[in-house]
UniProtKB/Swiss-Prot annotation:
Residues 77-147 form the HTH iclR-type domain. This is Monodictyphenone cluster transcriptional coactivator mdpA. It comes from Emericella nidulans (strain FGSC A4 / ATCC 38163 / CBS 112.46 / NRRL 194 / M139) (Aspergillus nidulans). Residues 281-305, 314-333 are annotated as: Disordered. Transcriptional coactivator; part of the gene cluster that mediates the biosynthesis of monodictyphenone, a prenyl xanthone derivative. With mdpE, coregulates the production of monodictyphenone. The keyword Protease does not apply. The keyword Membrane does not apply. GO terms for molecular function: DNA binding. Keywords: DNA-binding, Nucleus, Transcription, Transcription regulation. Residues 314-323 have a biased composition (Low complexity). One of its GO terms (cellular component) is nucleus.
């Protein structure tokens, strides 16, 4: 009991502190000037405000764990179940697009436009409004809220909902039957997904034939499972390497310029080469299902943050270098980060930069569309492409940024919940799983030559993220 009371006091203190931070960081607006669809914390808010926002949500989660009774728990599950069903219904009939982003509209008009019964629509709107999704400011009128409007302006959110409702939830509910029928099978066509969708084909082969799945799965992965790496930059900033003056850094398999720009601004004396997959070649790990390019983090927006646009512009204007696998473009258009160079490199190709001080290598995470054996093969190939460099350049360091499945209670509960969500999703869709830290280190132990091998010399991690930085050096054998 004393421990629980102590935790309650801690959560209360953290909540108060975070709320004060948001109040101090966010400009005050009167109710008349603030749009109904404008969120309290906008994407342009300071990093401190966004950190405080996450702290509040984390603290609320902790408070719920302390205070929730069995009845509360069941009620919450029932409400979430109905909310998901309502969102699927709204998405199926494209109702959200029928509601103007500003102002109100009669529910009757929306029902006629969407071709649905007005009584059904009214009841569903009133249910979702309890969660802040849509609003009924006056009886019989509907308007978008700050939570619902982005589902119109950013369709990927709706893709994630439809995938959750149409694929993930039905598959999850078939876990008991899958265990009864298939036991501990690892075959990708003997899964809860196969039973739920009554489909004998694997999820990977099915998604190859269905563009909708190709669109929905990455959206769900990014927005439904908190599959972000926004803590990597914070962890990298803890490295002593960046405080050693003028050093050369290569970021391999980057998804945006956010991280490089942040590091370049924090440490102006470093020079960073950002390597992305060549637009002419295959994607890093699955030609049919590339990893989604993540949007810039809040407050870090830049016209080159989306590498799809960047790739298209540089591919047509910059000649290939003498190396068959790369070509380079210097981002002179970025005055605040002029020490950044962009280079296209095919995954697992020989590393063309051999004299850098630091190599930051972003490796892929497991996916239902890529078997673990194939993933491991690509990871080993990428590591081996840097082995010779580390051997010939003893001062060079390789930094890996894996997101392993954490040990129980090793990270904050909501962070662990997201990791367990991804792990169970992989099992239900394809009998795949997240990789544990020991397995990552075991993979590294297989990267060697006749003179030495790669070893982990340091680990950096945080309770706020599942990402672990592995500092790798080449170690010669004792003869």
């Amino acid at each position: 009991m004393m421990s629980s009371l102590s935790d309650l006091e801690t959560h209360a203190s953290e909540l108060t502190s975070a709320v004060k931070t948001i109040i101090s960081q966010c400009p005050r607006q009167n109710a008349a000037s603030r749009s109904r669809t404008q969120p309290l914390i906008t994407s342009s808010a300071s990093k401190e405000a966004h950190r405080a926002q996450q702290s509040i949500l984390s603290t609320i989660s902790g408070l719920q764990k302390l205070l929730t009774s069995p009845t509360d728990f069941l009620h919450h599950l029932a409400v979430q179940n109905q909310l998901l069903a309502c969102l699927q219904w709204l998405g199926e009939f494209q109702v959200l697009a029928c509601i103007p982003l500003t102002g109100t509209v009669p529910i009757k008009d929306v029902a006629e436009l969407a071709g649905v019964p007005e009584t059904h629509l009214s009841r569903i709107i009133r249910m979702t409004a309890t969660a802040g999704f849509l609003d009924e400011p006056d009886p019989g009128q509907v308007a978008h809220s700050a939570l619902s409007a982005p589902f119109v302006t950013k369709p990927s959110y709706l893709d994630a909902v439809m995938f959750l409702a149409g694929t993930i939830a039905p598959s999850a509910l078939q876990m008991p039957t899958a265990t009864q029928r298939f036991g501990a099978s690892l075959r990708p066509n003997e899964t809860a997904y196969n039973l739920a969708l009554n489909n004998p084909a694997t999820f990977a082969s099915t998604s190859e034939q269905r563009p909708k799945l190709q669109r929905q799965w990455p959206a769900f992965l990014q927005y439904g499972t908190s599959d972000t790496d926004d803590r990597v930059t914070d962890l990298l900033s803890r490295l002593d390497h960046f405080r050693r003056g003028s050093i050369s850094v290569v970021e391999v398999s980057a998804r945006s310029l956010d991280r490089a720009t942040t590091l370049a601004n924090l440490y102006p004396s470093i020079n960073i080469t950002v390597q992305i997959a060549s637009p002419a070649g295959p994607t890093a790990w699955s030609p049919a299902h590339p990893n989604p390019i993540r949007p810039p983090t809040p407050g870090g927006s830049h016209k080159h943050d989306d590498l799809r646009a960047l790739t298209a512009s540089t591919a047509s204007t910059t000649p290939a270098s003498s190396h068959n696998h790369t070509h380079t473009h210097t981002t002179n258009s970025i005055p605040q980060a002029s020490n950044i160079t962009i280079q296209h490199r095919l995954p697992t190709a020989p590393q063309p930069i051999t004299s850098a001080n630091l190599y930051i290598l972003h490796l892929p995470s497991p996916s239902p569309t890529v078997p673990f054996a194939s993933l491991a093969t690509h990871i080993l190939a990428e590591l081996r492409s840097h082995l010779d460099i580390l051997r010939s350049n003893p001062s060079a360091t390789l930094i890996l940024t894996p997101r392993p499945l954490p040990e129980p209670s090793a990270v904050h509960s909501e962070v662990e919940a997201s990791a367990r969500l991804r792990d169970l999703t992989l099992m239900q869709l394809a009998n795949e799983r997240e990789i544990e830290l020991a397995e990552w280190i075991n993979l590294l132990s297989n990267v060697s030559d006749s003179m030495g091998r790669l070893v982990v010399v340091n680990k950096i991690q945080s309770r706020e993220s599942t990402v672990v930085l592995l500092e790798i050096r080449y170690q010669a054998y004792n003869r």
